Curated annotation (Swiss-Prot):
PANTHER family: IMIDAZOLE GLYCEROL PHOSPHATE SYNTHASE SUBUNIT HISH, IMIDAZOLE GLYCEROL PHOSPHATE SYNTHASE SUBUNIT HISH 1. IGPS catalyzes the conversion of PRFAR and glutamine to IGP, AICAR and glutamate. The HisH subunit provides the glutamine amidotransferase activity that produces the ammonia necessary to HisF for the synthesis of IGP and AICAR. The gene is hisH1. It holds the Pfam family GATase. It catalyses: 5-[(5-phospho-1-deoxy-D-ribulos-1-ylimino)methylamino]-1-(5-phospho-beta-D-ribosyl)imidazole-4-carboxamide + L-glutamine = D-erythro-1-(imidazol-4-yl)glycerol 3-phosphate + 5-amino-1-(5-phospho-beta-D-ribosyl)imidazole-4-carboxamide + L-glutamate + H(+); L-glutamine + H2O = L-glutamate + NH4(+). The active site is at 82 (nucleophile), 191, 193. Pathway: Amino-acid biosynthesis; L-histidine biosynthesis; L-histidine from 5-phospho-alpha-D-ribose 1-diphosphate: step 5/9. This is Imidazole glycerol phosphate synthase subunit HisH 1.
Length: 213
């Protein structure tokens, strides 16, 4: 039977490019949906996001999706992307501080306006290709080399509260969590749908993953 992948639509995300990338890797039925019943019935769920975290969390709470995300991420493969990843943390310092869903301990921090590396001033947002160092083996890293490059666009980074949940490290002036995992949940700061070969491989791995780790 064909599996169903739900891409959660709460009005804040690069939804159709994510959906197209999932279709490209053979995800089966890909449904971009804001219907809680459709999302609950899906075999696996993707939670993308772009924009300001305050706006994202306001919509998530208005739709009741904070509880929905907690529910559906417990018992099936679940992938958070970019701001969708940041929303899974406890709190973001963006917009004078915003409480988030709290599935992963930790904070979302601003890179700052005075970010330097080896004497060079770094522009914020962090935009472009950067390496991800794999901290541990995980099914979603299958056939992706360590230090592979992925595409990032973000002004805020994740300071993880539990180092054991960090499965991928990034560096841009400061070290940050590029990927987090716990049980059937996996979340990435980068955009796999924009990351060419390695990004598509990660999505293909997600589609094949049974949610165990």
């Amino acid at each position: 039977m064909m599996q169903t992948v739900a891409v959660i639509d709460y009005g804040m995300g690069n939804l159709h490019s994510v959906a197209k990338a999932l279709e490209h890797v053979g995800a089966g039925r890909v449904l971009v949906s804001s219907d809680a019943a459709v999302i609950r019935e899906a075999d696996r769920v993707v939670f993308p996001g772009v924009g300001a975290i305050r706006d994202c969390m306001a919509e998530i709470r208005r739709l009741g999706f904070d509880a929905l995300v907690r529910e559906v991420s417990q018992d099936r493969p679940f992938l958070g992307i970019c701001v969708g990843m940041q929303a899974l943390l406890e709190r973001s310092e963006e917009n004078d501080g915003v409480d988030c869903i709290g599935l992963f301990p930790g904070q979302v921090r601003f890179f700052g306006k005075d970010l330097h590396e080896a004497g060079e001033h770094l522009k914020v947002p962090h935009m472009g290709w950067n390496q991800v160092s794999q901290a541990v083996e995980h099914p979603l890293w299958h056939e992706i080399p360590d230090q592979a490059r992925f595409y990032f666009v973000h002004s805020y980074y994740i300071e993880a509260g539990n180092p054991r949940q960090v499965v991928g490290h990034g560096h841009y002036g400061v070290d940050f969590a590029a990927a987090l995992a716990e049980g059937s949940r996996f979340a990435v700061q980068f955009h796999p749908e924009k990351s060419h070969t390695h990004g598509l491989q990660l999505l293909q791995n997600f589609v094949a993953w049974d949610g165990r780790w």
